[in-house]
Amino acid sequence: MKTILKILGGLVGLVLVLAIALVTWLSLREYRPEAEEIVEIEGSGNSLLKAGDSLSLVTCNIGYGGLDAEHDFFMDGGSDVRVESRQIVERNMEGIRSMLQEAEGDIYFLQEVDIDSKRSYGFNESEYLQEGLKGAAAFADNFLCDYVPYPLPTIGRVHSGILTVNHYMAESAVRVALPTSFTWPVRVCQLKRCLLVERVPLEGSDKELVLINLHLDAYDDGTGREMQTRQLAELLNAEYEKGNYCIAGGDFNQTFSNIDPSLYPVQDRENFSPGLVEVSDFGEGWQLANDPSTPTCRLLNQPYDPKDAATQHYVLDGFLLSPNVKLEQVQTIDGGFRYTDHNPVKITVTLSE
């Protein structure tokens, strides 16, 4: 009996030592971005922009090519950690790229774009999308971890971020770090959220078009999203006070104050509970641009079945426009969640003279 207890004690001790070693290693290797970092712009846009011009923007969370209609996700109440093969990722990415090309945007804000992750079988999605969409491309890391040790099987290595592809001549791009509510040791393997801020000079003017690509917190208690939205509002208002034109867009992981909540009532708050973007928090004249006629996101608690009562839809994706940007049209492009758990949103706007 004593021998058995010694063996069990030794095994428990070994597990503890390995766990401590893993946490220590991950802590030493934790991605710790600066408050602001310059982002390299690859390629170049071929169009100039000036006040009075109209332009179109498309935002889409591509779900790293692994969240198609046939799959669920463990964080949303499902069981899948990744799809079964690289071929599925490639098929999804081909469908996503075609859908974005057909949207014919001048500027694309894309989220959950993998560079080299186990979950997407090492497929470089940023490079693939840049080849298909053309233009000036800026990529900002927001999930960089050598090994995410949960669930079983584990997520493993992740290198992912947000990508802006711009057909106009961008002057600069900066990664702006966002606050988080997560603390050590949970923080070590969590996303490091950010804003990807790109500046486009306006012909014949000292003003700029400020583009902000974003992907805010999802699986926190709501505190992180609130802090991140507050920082976004401060940045946008500071730029608008300079006379600049501002367009922020992406996956807010929140619903919007201009949408009737009864359109897509939240039935499942246990697996995901979205916050609320209140447009009045941004100041007078700011405008939310979204199209609630079609949902932009689904809960990944199960493979997609639009007729199932357990299917949960949301409107979490869209744009925020400064008072000097006029909204001409907004449309949620219905992709049927075939290749990703989000639908693209396209807007056409005019920069007021």
Language model: regions and residue ranges:
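N-terminal, active-site-proximal structural segment of metallo-dependent hydrolase catalytic domains
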Residues: 2-150, 154-159, 353
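A well-ordered secondary-structure block
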Residues: 33, 144-209, 213
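Active-site beta-strand/loop signature of hydrolases that rely on acidic residues for catalysis
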Residues: 56-62, 92-122, 165, 198, ...
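Solvent-exposed loop/turn segments at secondary-structure junctions
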Residues: 64-65, 114-117, 143-146, 170-171, ...
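Surface-exposed cleft-lining segments at the edges of enzyme active sites
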Residues: 79-85, 113-115, 179-187, 215-223
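Conserved beta strand-loop-helix elements of the APE1-like EEP
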Residues: 131-133, 157-173, 199-201, 281, ...
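Metal-dependent phosphoesterases centered on the DNase I-like endonuclease/exonuclease/phosphatase
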Residues: 220-323
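Low-complexity, intrinsically disordered Gly/Pro/Thr-rich segments
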Residues: 325-336
